[in-house]
């Protein structure tokens, strides 16, 4: 089997906050699969892409990881937990390994990270919902792409199903 070696310019790192892109911490596997399809189209995910998906709760991680497929899952509990976990995953000289970084979130916490990468010659793209893009992040990057608005879906729980007589 032949090994394909990609140059730094061809390699991409995607840091994806699933909860931010869906607009809710309550989601189903079907919602995550639909998000991935849309995300890959909007971000123009390349063949040499590494994807890291983050959540802010361990209870969401398994659903997101299994539904997304092929991505490295990370989490940190609490407010901004997914953001912190994703920043930690991208904090190892990415400018030396990747020609493009895609941030799947509109949160302001990524603004300094994105601006620093651009100064180092890395192409940075932000993919987010229009209503979730922070002004600071918008000013920090040259390429912002919007997901189409979707309605968040809550997981179905037994009490929501009703009774059959």
Regions found by a protein language model. Give the residues of each.
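Domain-level signal for Mg2+-assisted phosphodiester chemistry and nucleotide/NA-binding surfaces
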Residues: 1-82, 123
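Nuclease catalytic cores that cleave nucleic-acid phosphodiester bonds
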Residues: 57-165
